[in-house]
């Protein structure tokens, strides 16, 4: 438990920061789900457009420290591979 004023302030800031980070993480997951939904429907154009929208947002979350660089790259790579497989079929 926070005892001195500076640690109490840090605890308050952590609560705010955690809530903000959770909302950003949720937003990114929603964009990823939109891409996955387009892939499930078999819409190549819709999936590529959704990925084009989602990729810069995923990258910006890396800069903010919400996701690691490797997780973002892995996610984008897997989505792109699914889209390429969709086009091939």
UniProtKB/Swiss-Prot annotation:
GO MF annotations in UniProt: small ribosomal subunit rRNA binding; structural constituent of ribosome
Gene3D superfamilies, per database record: Ribosomal protein S20
Keyword 4Fe-4S: no
Protein's organism: Hahella chejuensis (strain KCTC 2396)
Function recorded in the entry: Binds directly to 16S ribosomal RNA.
Annotated coiled-coil segments of the chain: none
Annotated GO CC locations: cytosol; small ribosomal subunit
Protein name from the UniProt record: Small ribosomal subunit protein bS20
A Pfam family the protein falls into: Ribosomal_S20p
InterPro entries reported in the protein's UniProt record: Ribosomal_bS20, Ribosomal_bS20_sf
Database matches in NCBIfam families: S20
A single GO BP: translation
Family classification: Belongs to the bacterial ribosomal protein bS20 family.
Gene: rpsT
Taxonomic superkingdom: Bacteria
